[in-house]
Regions:
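C-terminal motif of bacterial Sec signal peptides marking the signal peptidase cleavage site
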Residues: 18-21
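Feature for extracytoplasmic/surface-facing segments of secreted or surface-associated proteins
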Residues: 26-366, 373-384
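Low-complexity, Pro/Ser/Thr- and charge-rich linker/hinge segments at domain boundaries
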Residues: 112-118, 390-399, 556-594
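Signal that preferentially marks extracellular ectodomain short beta-strand elements
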Residues: 334-340, 475-533, 658-686
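Short beta-strand edge/turn micro-motifs at domain boundaries
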Residues: 355-407, 414, 706-709
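Conserved aromatic anchor
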Residues: 412-423, 602-621
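Solvent-exposed loop/turn segments flanking beta-strands in beta-repeat/beta-sandwich domains
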Residues: 420-486, 616-651, 687-690
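Beta-strand-rich modules
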Residues: 540-542, 683-704
C-alpha cells in the first residue's frame, strides 16, 4: 500500500472554510450534505461527448436533476445537485448510442466529476455486478456501498494498472482521473483517454473487463490488452512506447474532418454534384473534395470500393441538405505501423465515428485517414483491392413456429461480397475462394454459393470439409468445399430456454448454419472467447483458382474493434428489436411445411415483403437497426435439385420500424427468382417462398447484432 501511495497520492480535496464558518468565531458548522452543490467537469472519451445529456442519481436511485444537463461542445458541463438530494451520486452521460458513468461519494467531496472511460472503469469496479449501468440501483438496494474510501481504493487499482501509459505520457503521478482538470483536445490527460479502449461485458453477477492500448501497430499484429474480472486485481498494461501512441492533438483533427463531411452534406445537392452525377469525378462541392486526400475523392479506395452513388459515401449523391446529416463522436482506433503493398501506408489513421440526421437515424462506422500536406486529416480508405471485413456478431435465432427451439449464438460474420468478388467480375478475375485465419490461428474457408454463375447469397459463405451427411468434401487444394448458406460462424450457442444438453445442441439439429468446428465440433468456452483480442487481426487470402499449389492473388488484413461476446454477455447487455405481434400472427397463420414438416415457409405474393417491428425502450442501450433481410426459395421441392435459395435485403435509417423489401433489392440485373424487365420493377416470381426475416442492428461499439426470425423447425 505504501508503494501505491507513493505513486499516486490519491487524496480527497476537502472544502476549506473560514474560522467563523467552522465555529472558530462562535458560529455553527455548515452541513454540506444538506446544501445544494454545483458540480463541474469534463465528459470525454478522448473526444468531447458534445451535446450528450447528463443525469445524476442519488442514494435512493432517483434522478436528482429536474432537467438533464447538456454537455458543451468542449465536453464541459455544470450541474447543481439540489439540497434535498443525498449521496453517493452516480453520474450518467448519454449521447444516444452509449452511456458512460462516474461517481461522487458525497457533497463534501471535490465538486469536480469527470465522466470518461476511466471513470466508467472505476464505476464497474465499485458495482457489485461489475456493470456501471446497475450502480445507481445497487446503491439504492444497499447491495453496493460507495464511500470515499471505496472510491479511492477502486481508483488506485485502476491507475496502478494504467501506470505504464501515464508514465509514457509524463503525466503527474498524483493525477486523479475523477477530478483532474483537463481539456479534451488530445493532449495531456486527454491523450491518455485517446490511447485507451475499455470494454465491459456484463454477465449476470460478474462482468469481464478488457482494456486495450490503442497505438501504432503493424497490419498483421494485434493491439495489446489486459483482461480481468471486475472484482479481481488487474494486471498492469505492458510497457508503453510513447512514440507509438496517438500524436498529440490527433482527436481534434479527426473532429475537423467530420465537420468537413458535415459541411459537405449541408451543401445543396444541386451544387454538391453535377446533375445526375454518380461518380467521384462528378463531385463539385469544395467542402466534399476537401474531406479527401489531395482534395480528390477519386483517390479513395476501401476494400475495392470507391466513392460513388452505389458504393462508399453514396449519400453525397442522393441525400438532400434538409436531412441535416452530421458526423460526430470521433474515436481513434490505431495507426498503421508498416506500409502494406496495395494497402494502407505507414502512419495512416484508423478511426471511428457516428453519423446521424434530423429524422433520428444514426449508425456507427469506421474508416481510414491520412495526414495531408496541409497537416489536416483526410479520407483515403484502406487502399485494399478486394472486399474485406469481419466483425463480432450476436444473434437470437427465433423459431416463430417452434418457440422452444429459439437459441442465442455469438461469433463473427464476414464481409465478403459475392457480387463484387465473383459475379460482377469478368472471367479470369473472379475470386473463387478466400482463406481466413483468425487471431488465434484457426483457419476457415469462404466460397461463393452460386447457381448458374449467379450469387444465391450476397456474401461468400463458410465452407466445410464434410457435408450434412458426414461425407468428406474438399476442393483441388484440399480445402473445405461444402457451401453452407451463411457467413456467420457461431462460436457458442445456447437455447433461450437454458437447455444445454449436448445431444440437443442446435448444431446437431440444424445443419444449414455454421458452427465452429463444423457439424460435429464443440463450442468455445467463455474463457476461450474472452481470450480473443478485442482488436484482433484476421488475415484474408484471395484465390482466383482452386488448383493445387496455387498462391493467393492478394493477402489483406482486418482488425476488429471488439471481440465476440459470450452468449451470457449478449443476453445481459444487448436489447433487440422484434417483429410486431400482427406480423408474427400473420406468418404463423400462413405457414406451410415440407420435408417432414421441418422446412416451413410462407408463399410470397408478387409485391414486396413488408416487415414491421418494435424497438427496445431505452435508446441509450438500443442498437441502431439499419438492415432488414429476407431469405427464401424458388420452386420449393426440398429433395429436388431445382430449387434456388435467395436472400434480399434493404438498408434504412435507424428511426424506421417498417421496411418493404423488393425482389432482387439493389441488384443490377433481374434475378432468377424475380419477374420483370429491369431491377427497378422486379417482383417476386411465381412459386416463391419466404422462410426467414432478419433484423440487423449496430451496437455502440460498431458490432452487429441480429434478431433472426425463421419459420423453419429444428425437429
Amino acid at each position: 500500500m505504501a508503494k501505491k501511495e507513493k505513486l499516486f497520492k490519491l487524496t480527497t480535496v476537502l472544502a476549506l472554510c473560514s474560522l467563523a464558518a467552522c465555529g472558530g468565531g462562535g458560529g455553527s458548522a455548515v452541513n454540506l450534505e444538506t446544501q445544494p452543490l454545483t458540480v463541474t467537469g469534463i465528459a470525454a472519451t478522448g473526444a468531447p461527448m458534445a451535446n450528450a445529456t447528463l443525469q445524476i442519481y442519488g442514494k435512493d436511485g432517483a434522478a436528482v436533476l429536474a432537467t438533464p444537463a447538456t454537455i458543451s461542445t468542449d465536453g464541459s458541463y455544470s450541474a447543481t445537485i439540489p439540497a434535498t438530494a443525498t449521496g453517493p451520486f452516480v453520474f450518467e452521460v448519454d449521447n444516444g448510442s452509449e452511456k458512460v458513468y462516474s461517481v461522487l461519494p458525497s457533497k463534501s467531496s471535490t465538486p469536480v466529476v469527470n465522466v470518461t472511460q476511466i471513470s466508467n472503469l472505476i464505476a464497474a469496479r465499485l458495482s457489485s455486478t461489475g456493470n456501471p449501468f446497475n450502480l445507481a440501483s445497487e446503491i439504492a438496494a444497499a447491495s453496493t456501498t460507495v464511500t470515499s474510501t471505496a472510491v479511492t481504493s477502486a481508483t488506485t487499482s485502476v491507475m496502478t494498472a494504467l501506470q505504464p501509459l501515464a508514465t509514457a505520457l509524463s503525466l503527474n503521478g498524483t493525477i486523479n482521473p475523477l477530478n483532474t482538470t483537463f481539456t479534451a483536445n488530445g493532449t495531456g490527460f486527454d491523450r491518455m483517454l485517446d490511447s485507451l479502449d475499455v470494454k465491459i461485458e456484463p454477465k449476470g453477477t460478474k462482468s469481464q473487463i478488457e482494456v486495450t492500448l490503442k497505438q501504432s501497430v503493424n497490419e498483421n499484429q494485434d493491439l495489446p490488452q489486459i483482461s480481468f474480472a471486475h472484482d479481481a486485481t488487474p494486471a498492469a498494461l505492458p510497457a508503453v512506447d510513447a512514440t507509438k501512441l496517438a500524436t498529440s492533438g490527433l482527436t481534434p483533427k479527426i473532429q475537423l474532418l467530420l465537420e468537413k463531411l458535415t459541411s459537405c452534406y449541408a451543401d445543396p445537392l444541386s451544387t454538391r454534384i453535377t446533375s445526375g452525377g454518380t461518380t467521384a469525378a462528378d463531385i463539385q462541392s469544395q467542402n466534399c473534395k476537401d474531406a479527401f486526400i489531395g482534395g480528390n475523392p477519386a483517390g479513395y479506395k476501401s476494400g475495392g470500393m470507391v466513392v460513388s452513388k452505389t458504393q462508399h459515401f453514396g449519400g453525397i449523391f442522393t441525400t438532400d441538405a434538409a436531412a441535416g446529416v452530421s458526423f460526430s463522436d470521433p474515436k481513434f482506433f490505431y495507426s498503421v505501423g508498416t506500409t502494406v503493398a496495395n494497402g494502407p501506408t505507414s502512419g495512416d489513421i484508423v478511426f471511428g465515428y457516428r453519423w446521424k440526421d434530423e429524422y433520428g437515424n444514426f449508425n456507427i462506422e469506421k474508416n481510414v485517414g491520412r495526414i495531408d500536406t496541409d497537416g489536416k486529416l483526410k479520407l483515403i480508405g484502406n487502399q485494399y483491392s478486394y472486399d474485406i471485413g469481419v466483425g463480432a456478431y450476436s444473434q437470437r435465432r427465433n423459431y416463430v413456429n417452434q418457440a422452444a427451439s429459439t437459441f442465442n449464438s455469438v461469433g463473427y460474420t464476414f464481409g465478403l461480397s459475392c457480387y463484387q468478388l465473383n459475379q460482377f467480375q469478368s472471367a479470369g478475375n473472379k475470386i473463387v475462394k478466400v482463406n481466413v485465419t483468425s487471431p488465434g490461428g484457426r483457419k476457415m474457408t469462404f466460397i461463393p454459393n452460386l447457381s448458374s454463375g449467379n450469387c444465391n447469397y450476397s456474401y461468400f459463405v463458410i465452407a466445410f470439409g464434410k457435408d450434412k451427411t458426414g461425407t468428406a468434401t474438399v476442393d483441388g487444394m484440399g480445402d473445405p468445399s461444402f457451401a453452407t448458406g451463411t457467413g456467420f460462424v457461431r462460436l457458442q450457442s445456447f437455447y433461450e430456454s437454458g437447455d444445454t444438453t449436448a445431444t440437443n445442441h442446435p448444431r446437431k439439429l440444424d445443419k444449414n448454419i455454421a458452427f465452429i468446428g463444423g457439424f460435429d465440433g464443440t463450442d468455445l468456452t467463455n474463457e476461450e472467447i474472452e481470450a480473443i483480442p478485442q482488436f484482433g487481426t484476421w488475415t484474408f487470402e484471395y484465390y482466383k483458382t482452386k488448383t493445387a499449389g496455387s498462391t493467393p492473388v492478394a493477402t489483406q488484413y482486418f482488425k476488429t474493434t471488439a471481440r465476440s461476446l459470450t452468449v451470457d454477455g449478449f443476453k445481459k447487455s444487448v436489447k433487440l428489436p422484434a417483429i410486431t405481434a400482427d406480423l408474427k400472427t400473420n406468418l404463423i397463420a400462413n405457414t406451410s411445411c415440407a420435408n417432414n414438416s421441418v422446412y416451413c415457409y410462407v408463399k410470397q405474393a408478387t409485391g414486396p415483403f413488408v416487415a414491421t417491428w418494435t424497438k427496445p425502450t431505452d435508446p441509450g442501450l438500443m442498437p441502431a437497426t439499419y438492415l432488414a433481410r429476407v431469405y427464401g426459395m424458388k420452386d420449393v421441392s426440398i429433395n429436388s435439385a431445382s430449387w434456388v435459395g435467395f436472400e434480399d435485403s434493404i438498408k434504412f435509417g435507424s428511426s424506421r420500424a417498417t421496411a418493404s423489401i423488393r425482389c432482387g433489392q439493389g441488384e443490377s440485373t433481374v434475378q432468377p427468382y424475380c419477374s420483370g424487365t429491369s431491377p427497378s420493377n422486379a417482383n417476386f416470381g411465381t412459386n416463391v417462398s419466404i422462410d426467414a426475416l432478419d433484423l440487423v442492428s449496430r451496437a455502440p461499439d460498431g458490432t452487429d447484432v441480429s434478431h433472426f426470425h425463421t419459420l423453419k423447425k429444428l425437429q
